[in-house]
């Protein structure tokens, strides 16, 4: 159960609690949710099973997995792509994760709601552009992640997941109950659950596919790394379903928590990424016991962030540990220091380095663009092609059925899907994210 919860924690994180609600809000609500769920089932689960197979069969880190399965070839570069993507994502995720600790502290100290007529937009911008405070909180969050990683898989990651995942659900449920009892909460629930198919454009469909890919941590090596710790009797098909269902449930609960409150206070649902740090403090400020609800929410967000940073950190740590034959403590320290150093530039890009751009983007945004729009789709697509074309199908079936003890009636369809359908679907997302699809179609 611990390894399943750890894998759930790998997939469930900021992508579900922070990114999903504002993506849903920006893409029309229920119609986006419906398409998102379909993609989670028909694309997410098969690709996840594939990454589970690679990890458990090879019993190695992301690079080592491809080296063992295709020695002497260039396929190992899929692993290098995943590790680099995880490292880069961790560097800027740690900045956002640090913000969650700042808001927990502001709430506990009474500062967030202890001042009359506070401008939450200016307050957030002042904090994010500060040279020292965001870096301090980023360092604290990296230190917390480092502590869990150094404790190892069983004592650290699995134990933390056993505690955090049930707590995450409990806090989400408490916040959902509070949100749906607000005036005009029905409008938020209708937005979330009543589809308006007139809003279902090609852009919304592709955004839903991209969010499904992002939510399940596909293509960044996390699932390959975690599945390398699976037991030989782990049912990888069932685990993929469990992870996907729990991930989707968390995302939907996050929507129930946020949108009734947004509609209750007349806030636009497409407020964007700042919904969490600018819009929601305004909402909490108008509630009785505002400090309590705010504190509960930001603790929830910090926990979601920690599940993300742990999984990303473990990808890089496992590689350094195994490939360079280091102790876990030394490997984790190297990764933590590297992440902290790179994260400084992401943090400063909101302030003193705002004028420094890479390809017209601030440093933080450039890393997000590089990883989310190029490295992850590319890695996922190549992984599907690798399994569909290079892996012995007898070996694949034996592994996925635990040497014939489990049934896999749709194995033939699964192989066809991985060889043709999944790479094409992910390729479409890849081309869309780069803007190439719009250029080709002229739309």
Locate the predicted segments by residue.
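Transmembrane helix-boundary motif of multi-pass solute transporters/channels
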Residues: 2-39, 224-227, 238-241, 245-246, ...
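Inter-helical loop and helix-membrane interface segments of multi-pass membrane transporters/permeases
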Residues: 22-27, 57-81, 94-154, 183-207, ...
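Select transmembrane alpha-helical segments in multipass membrane proteins
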Residues: 1-7, 32-35, 74-87, 136-141, ...
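Loop-to-transmembrane helix boundary motifs in multi-pass membrane proteins
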Residues: 1-4, 10, 135-136, 246-252, ...
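Membrane-embedded translocation segments of transport machinery
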Residues: 1, 158, 162-306, 324, ...
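C-terminal membrane-solvent junction of multi-pass transporters and transport-like membrane proteins
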Residues: 71, 78-81, 325-336, 368-426
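Membrane-interface "cap" regions at the ends of multi-pass membrane proteins
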Residues: 1-18, 45-52, 56-69, 73-80, ...
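Helix-loop-helix connectors at the membrane interface of multi-pass transporters/channels
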Residues: 64, 97-128, 229-233, 238, ...
């Amino acid at each position: 159960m611990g390894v399943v919860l750890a894998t759930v924690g790998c997939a469930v994180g900021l992508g579900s609690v922070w990114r999903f609600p504002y993506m849903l809000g920006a893409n029309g609500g229920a119609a986006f949710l419906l398409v998102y769920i379909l993609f989670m089932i028909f694309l997410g689960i098969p690709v996840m099973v594939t990454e589970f197979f690679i990890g458990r069969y090879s019993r190695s880190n992301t690079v080592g997995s491809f080296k063992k399965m295709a020695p002497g070839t260039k396929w190992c570069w899929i692993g290098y792509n995943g590790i680099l993507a995880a490292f880069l994502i961790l560097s800027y995720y740690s900045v956002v994760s640090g913000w969650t600790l700042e808001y927990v502290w502001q709430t506990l100290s009474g500062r967030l709601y202890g001042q009359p007529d506070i401008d939450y937009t200016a307050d957030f911008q002042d904090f994010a552009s500060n040279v020292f405070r965001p870096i301090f909180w980023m360092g604290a969050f990296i230190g917390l992640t480092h502590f869990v990683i150094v404790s190892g898989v069983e004592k650290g990651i699995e134990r933390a997941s056993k505690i955090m995942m049930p707590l995450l659900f409990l806090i989400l449920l408490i916040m959902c109950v509070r949100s749906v009892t607000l005036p005009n909460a029905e409008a938020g629930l209708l937005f979330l659950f009543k589809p308006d198919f007139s809003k279902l454009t090609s852009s919304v469909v592709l955004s839903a596919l991209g969010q499904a890919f992002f939510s399940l941590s596909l293509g960044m090596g996390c699932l390959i790394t975690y599945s390398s710790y699976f037991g030989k009797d782990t049912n990888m098909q069932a685990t993929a379903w469990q992870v996907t269902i729990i991930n989707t449930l968390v995302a939907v609960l996050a929507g129930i928590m946020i949108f009734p409150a947004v509609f209750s206070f007349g806030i636009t649902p497409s407020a964007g990424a700042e919904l969490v740090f600018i819009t929601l403090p305004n909402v909490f400020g108008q509630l009785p016991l505002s400090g309590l609800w705010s504190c509960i929410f930001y603790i929830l967000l910090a926990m979601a962030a920690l599940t993300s940073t742990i999984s990303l950190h473990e990808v890089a740590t496992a590689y350094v540990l195994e490939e360079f034959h280091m102790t876990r403590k030394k490997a984790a320290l190297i990764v933590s220091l590297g992440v902290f150093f790179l994260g400084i530039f992401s943090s400063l890009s909101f302030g003193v380095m705002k004028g420094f751009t890479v390809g017209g983007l601030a440093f933080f945004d450039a890393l997000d663009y590089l990883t989310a729009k190029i490295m992850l789709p590319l890695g996922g697509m190549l992984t599907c092609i690798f399994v569909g074309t290079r892996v012995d199908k007898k070996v694949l079936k034996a592994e996925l059925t635990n040497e014939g003890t489990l049934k896999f009636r749709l194995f033939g369809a699964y192989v066809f899907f991985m060889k043709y359908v999944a790479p094409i679907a992910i390729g479409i997302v890849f081309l869309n994210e780069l803007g190439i699809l719009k250029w080709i179609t002229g739309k």
